[in-house]
Amino acid sequence: MWRLLHCILGFIRLYLDGVKVLLYQLFNKSFRLPDLPEQNGKVAIVTGGTRGMGYEISRHLVSLDMHVIIAGNEEEEGLAAVKKIQEELNQGKVEFMYLDLASLTSVRQFVQRYNAKGLPLHVLVNNAGVMLVPERRTEDGFELHFGLNYLGHFLLTNLLLGALRKTGKPGKCSRIVIMSSATHYGGRLTLDDLQGRLCYSSHAAYAQSKLALLLLSYHLQEQLLVRGDPVTVNAVDPGMVDTALYDNLCSPAQVAKKPFAKLLFRTPAEGASTAIYAAAASELEGIGGLYLYNGRKTESSALSYDKRLQTKLWKQSCALVGLK
């Protein structure tokens, strides 16, 4: 009975958040990117950069003369994305590197391979994610939304902090961009059951993962500020975007989504615009700790600003991935 109620509440919260976003998108134009400065060979990693918003982020950063590493778990798709970008653009550099965020071993191997290249790291865009996946576990035993969307990015970010710190300089900070979502407003974080073992709902699991990413963003930014590190962290809400994230909707919801998607959803390029802005806009130099929606600073949920919760999640995450 409790499991059923939990599923229903998660479903209701997620779709209420969705309705609010659609109403906003109905009456407000999508954020239009301003002219952004040339990046002069700066290096960026974009997770999930093979398709959808990740591809659009990668393509646009390459167009600004960035060296972009597309990180993904589908090599054939990744190489195809690289080829397409190279054919479209005459500047910048793009390459693919294998990364499975659902595997902590793969995350560590990716960072080892990246560090072996001897490249600096100016921008890390944590974009990859899954949504509404039926109950599954990662190879490390974590619930998939929590393990891939959040925990994989948590480990990746921490392992790349050395490169980001080394690259950043006062007045020229390295940047971390974390893709959250409006679903975080309805998210709840159950620290004694982060894996949803007691009561699983794919809707609640997705919302929890997006709240966790926001808690990570705020806590990490504060840590970096205290240390005086030349690295900033900002979270981004892309809005409701017509991408493959919705492939796991049930059949009736898929049918209902189609007309709404054409009328109200953002395109992947539109959804990517705020993340691109966070990664490259000169007016955001040295500024972190923001939640950006449609190109503007926005208030996130009250729960996301809970410093005790941020700290508890950080400590628990370190224990789960084996960081001291």
Swiss-Prot record:
One of its GO terms (molecular function) is polyprenol dehydrogenase activity. Pfam families: adh_short. Keywords: Lipid droplet, NAD, NADP, Oxidoreductase. The active site is at 206 (proton acceptor). One of its GO terms (cellular component) is lipid droplet. It is found in: Lipid droplet. Disruption phenotype: Impaired fin pigmentation. Mutants have fin melanocyte pigment pattern defects and fewer xanthophores. Pathway: Protein modification; protein glycosylation. Its EC number is 1.1.1.441. It comes from the Eukaryota. The keyword NAD applies. It is an enzyme of class 1 (oxidoreductase). It catalyses: a di-trans,poly-cis-polyprenol + NAD(+) = a di-trans,poly-cis-polyprenal + NADH + H(+); a di-trans,poly-cis-polyprenol + NADP(+) = a di-trans,poly-cis-polyprenal + NADPH + H(+); a di-trans,poly-cis-dolichol + NADP(+) = a di-trans,poly-cis-dolichal + NADPH + H(+); a di-trans,poly-cis-dolichol + NAD(+) = a di-trans,poly-cis-dolichal + NADH + H(+). One of its GO terms (biological process) is dolichol biosynthetic process. The keyword NADP applies. PANTHER family: DEHYDROGENASE_REDUCTASE SDR FAMILY MEMBER ON CHROMOSOME X, RETINOL DEHYDROGENASE. Oxidoreductase that plays a key role in early steps of protein N-linked glycosylation by mediating two non-consecutive steps in dolichol biosynthesis. Acts both as a NAD(+)-dependent dehydrogenase and as a NADPH-dependent reductase during the conversion of polyprenol into dolichol. First catalyzes the NAD(+)-dependent dehydrogenation of polyprenol into polyprenal; polyprenal is then reduced into dolichal by srd5a3. It then catalyzes the NADPH-dependent reduction of dolichal into dolichol. This is Polyprenol dehydrogenase. It comes from Danio rerio (Zebrafish).
